[in-house]
């Protein structure tokens, strides 16, 4: 993201002086996940109910992200998997209807940034790191920072949060692939 942000700044001729607020475009964004299911994969999506995104293009470390996901709206590639995932042995959406992530640090990392933060699943909070890369959205002109796309990737071990149901057939690692389309708040 550092290289992408620097390229964006060089093409604009102006730098942002402080963190800029962005709103999520939920209809164009996806929080995707994947885990192993024997020789197959279970894939799915979860809707975002709230997002507070502040990006600082001069000082990346001043950027902050806070997101809330709706566990009750989760979908999976196998019909029974969504029901099992939301049930008491895995995410327990009746007791814990949301998953939250709040950044604690944003640091340059290769051609992107590492977003350090705390993720809360099933009422258990653990540290997590996501890798992020930022792009201008298709159809925007060079230097236009009003509409951006952020791709975040990472993984969590579901057992660390007590989501241990069907451990004999479903993998522990849940791989995340998040596409967040955002618009600057003026």
Where are these regions (language model features)?
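Sec-dependent signal peptide recognition
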Residues: 1-7
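Hydrophobic h-region of N-terminal signal peptides that target proteins for export
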Residues: 8-17
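Low-complexity, acidic/polar, glycine-enriched regions of mature
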Residues: 17-186
């Amino acid at each position: 993201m550092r290289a992408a942000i620097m390229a964006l700044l060089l093409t604009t001729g102006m730098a942002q002086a402080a963190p800029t607020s962005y709103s999520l475009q939920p209809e164009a964004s996806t929080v995707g996940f994947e885990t192993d299911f024997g020789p197959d994969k279970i894939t799915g999506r979860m809707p975002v109910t709230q997002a507070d995104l502040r990006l600082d293009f001069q000082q990346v470390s001043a950027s902050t992200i806070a997101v809330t996901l709706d566990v009750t709206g989760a979908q999976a590639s196998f019909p029974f998997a969504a029901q099992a995932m939301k049930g008491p042995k895995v995410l327990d959406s009746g007791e814990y209807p949301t998953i939250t992530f709040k950044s604690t640090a944003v640091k340059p990392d290769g051609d992107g940034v590492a977003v350090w933060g705390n993720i809360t699943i099933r009422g258990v909070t653990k540290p997590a790191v996501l890798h992020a890369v930022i792009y201008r959205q298709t159809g925007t002109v060079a230097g236009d920072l009003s509409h951006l796309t952020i791709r975040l990737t990472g993984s969590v071990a579901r057992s660390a949060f007590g989501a241990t149901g069907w451990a004999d057939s479903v993998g522990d690692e849940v791989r995340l692939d998040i596409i967040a389309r955002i618009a600057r708040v003026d």
